[in-house]
Amino acid sequence: MSKIVFFCIPAYGHTNPTLGVVRELTARGHEVRYYSYEPMRTLIEAAGAQFVACDPYDCEQHLTPADGARVGKDIAFSTHILVETTLALDEMVCADMRAYAPDCIVADSMAVWGKAVAKKLGIPFISSTTTFAFNRYSAKVMKQSGSQMLKMLLAMPKINHDLQRLRDRGYPIKNILDIIQNDDQTDTIVYTSPEFQPCADTFSDKYAFVGPSIRPATENIEKVHDVLIYISMGTVNNDLLPFYRTCIAAFADSPYQVILSTGEQIDRSALGTLPDNITALPHVDQIAVLQKADVFLSHCGMNSASESLYFGVPLVLFPQTNEQGGVAARVAELGAGLKLEKADAASIRTAVDAVLQTPSYRANAQNIRESFLRCGGAKAAVDKILSVADRK
C-alpha cells in the first residue's frame, strides 16, 4: 500500500478532476490524504480520501472558491496569495509530511505549497494540471493580452519580493517560472489528450496526458424534445442576469428543450415567467445533462469544455476570461465549436442553429471524445502516480 498526499486550491475546476483519481487510488487499496479547504470537504471525503483542512492554519487568507478561480488569472494576486499561503502552512505541512512520510505528493499546479514542500523535504512529486500544460511553445498559442503583460511587468518588483520570502524560509524557488510552469523533468499529470493540448509534441515524456477524469452522473435528466440545448456560465463568475434573460428570449419560440444553469446568485423570480420549453435551475448535474445534450452554450472553462467534448457535444463558445478564451480558441481551431461574437438574442439563436445544422461540429467533437477515451483517464493517472511513488 502506498501513501499519497494531494494538495489543491479551493476551486471546483481544480478539485473535480482529481476526485476520480482519488477514487481509483482508494479502490486499489492505497491511502490518500487530501489537504484543501472546507468548501471542498464533502466532495473530497465522498471520493474516499482523508480530508485535512488548511483553513485553521491559513487563517489570514480565508481562501474561497472565488479566490481559487482568480488564482492563475491575475499573476500578482496569484503570487502573493500562494506565497502567503505557503508560509502560513509551512510549519503544519512540513511537520505533517515528516510524520506521515508519504510515498508521493500530488499538488495542483497552483497549490505551490505542495510542490515547495516536496522539494524542501525530498518527497517524490507530481504536478496535477487541470488546464492546458504550459511551456514556451504553448505560451505562444495561448497569448496574454497587452494589458495583462503590462500588469505583470509592473508587478514584478512585488512578485520578486514575495519569492524572496520563500527563499528565506528554505524553499528552493529561483524565479516566477518555478511557480507558473513545470520543466521537462517534472512529472506532470494533464487532464486532457495530446490531440486537444496545444503543442503537445513539445512536452517531454514526464507529462502524462490522461484525458478528463469524469465522475458518474448522480441524476437522470429527461429529454422531452428532439433537441436539448444546455446553457451554463460555470460555478464562479456566473452573476449574468441580463445574459440569461437574453438566452430565454432567444429560445422562447424555438422547438428546443433548454436547460439553463444560473448559479446560486440569481433570483429565479428575476428571470420572469419561463416558456414551457425552458427550465432554469441554480444548479444541475452537468454530467447528466451533457449525456443528453445536443449543444452546450458555455463559458469555456477547461472542465466544462472537456466534459462537453467527452460526451461528443459541440459547443457555442462564450468565454469570460483570457484563460477561457484560450480554451475556446482551441475548441474552435479543432472545429468542435463556434464562438459567439455578440450576446444578443438573434446572435445566440443563429450560433446554436449553425452548430446544430452543420454536422462537422458534432463529428469533430466526437473525434476529440475518442482521443480522450484513448488516454486512460483516472486509471492512467493512478498508474503514473504509483510509478513515481515506487521511486521513493
Regions found by a protein language model. Give the residues of each.
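Nucleotide-activated sugar donor-binding and catalytic core shared by glycosyltransferases
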Residues: M1-R33, P39-Q50, A95-A99, C104-A107, ...
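Nucleotide-sugar-dependent glycosyltransferase catalytic domains
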Residues: S2-K3, H30-I229, M233-Y256
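Ser/Thr-centric signal marking residues that sit
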Residues: C8, T192, S232, S261-T262
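Short glycine- and Lys/Arg-enriched binding-loop motifs that mark or flank ligand-binding interfaces
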Residues: I9, Y207, Y230, I259, ...
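Short glycine-enriched loops at secondary-structure junctions
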Residues: P10, Y57, T131-F132, E264-Q265, ...
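Generic structural signal for alpha-helix starts
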Residues: S204, R215-A217, D267, P275, ...
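Residue-level signal for pocket-adjacent positions within structured domains
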Residues: A208, P216, I231, I266, ...
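Catalytic donor nucleotide-activated moiety binding site of glycosyltransferases and closely related
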Residues: T235, R245-T279
